[in-house]
Amino acid sequence: MAGETTKVVIVTGGSSGIGRCTASALKENGCSVYEFSRRNIPMDGVTHLSVDVTDEDAVHAAVQQVLQKETKIDAVINCAGFGISGAVEFTSMEQAKAQFDVNFFGTVAVNKAVLPFMRRQGKGHIVNISSVAAVAHIPFQTFYSASKAAVSSYSYALANEVKPYGIHVTVVELGDICTGFTKARQKSILGDAEYGGRISRSVSQMEHDEQNGMDPAAIGRYIADIVEKTKPAVVYVAGAQYKFLSLLCKLLPAAARGRIVGKLYG
C-alpha cells in the first residue's frame, strides 16, 4: 500500500511506447504505478494487471484490484491505443469500430470505472492521451483522427461535469513520436491505384515523420509531470511545432486548413 503522500496512478497501454515511458517516469517521480495492458512486460517498481480496455468487466475488475491494495487512486492516464491507415472507402466497418473501441471507448470504460471512487474521495486527475491529428485531420488516417477528436471533445466536456467534485480532466495532444506505434499500425493500401498512389505516399510521409519524431522518454516525463501539477490545464500540446500547428488549425478557416494538411499528406 502506498503511503499518504505517495500518488497512486493507473496507466493504460503501459507495456510499450508512450504508456511504458510514462509509467517509468511516474515510478521515478516516486508514484505507486499500476499498469493495465494485455501483455506483461515486467518493469521494476510497476505493478502489471492484465487488462483489455475494450472489455468493460475486465477494466472494472482491475480497478477493484487496485482499490483492494490501495486506499486511493490519485490519477489515471489513458495511453492505450493504436492506429489504422487506408482509404475510408476500402476500410471495413469492423476495422473502423475496432479503432474507436480501443482509442475512444477504452478510455471511456477506464474512466467510468474510476470516476465513482474519485467522486467519493473528492479528488482525482484523469489524463487522456489524444493527438494533434484531432485538429489536423489527416487523410488516409481518417478513423484515427476521428477517434482522437472524440477523445479530445469528450475530455473537454467531462472536465466540466466532474470539476465540482475536485476531479481534474486533462487531454494531452501529442505529435509525431518515435515509438513502435509506426510498426504496429494496421496499414492498408487497398485502392491505391484508384487514388493515384496517394494512399501509399500519405502513409510513407506519416511513417517518416513518426520515425523522426520526438523522444518517447521525454514525452513520458512530460506526461508524468502533468500529474504532479496542483492546478493542471484542461489541454496540453507537447512540442513547440505541434503547439503552433494545433493553434494554426484552430484559427484557420476549414478550407485553408484542408489545403495545408492536403499538401502534406494528401
Predicted regions and their residues:
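Residue(s) in the substrate-gating loop at a strand-loop-helix junction
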Residues: 131
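SDR active-site lid
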Residues: 164-233
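N-terminal Rossmann NAD(P)H-binding glycine-rich loop of SDR-like oxidoreductase domains
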Residues: 15, 23
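Conserved NAD(P)H cofactor-binding loop of Rossmann-fold oxidoreductase domains
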Residues: 79-84
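Rossmann-fold cofactor-recognition segment
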Residues: 44-57
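Substrate-binding pocket helix/loop in short-chain dehydrogenase/reductase
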Residues: 87-88, 95-97
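Active-site helix of classical SDR
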Residues: 111, 147-150
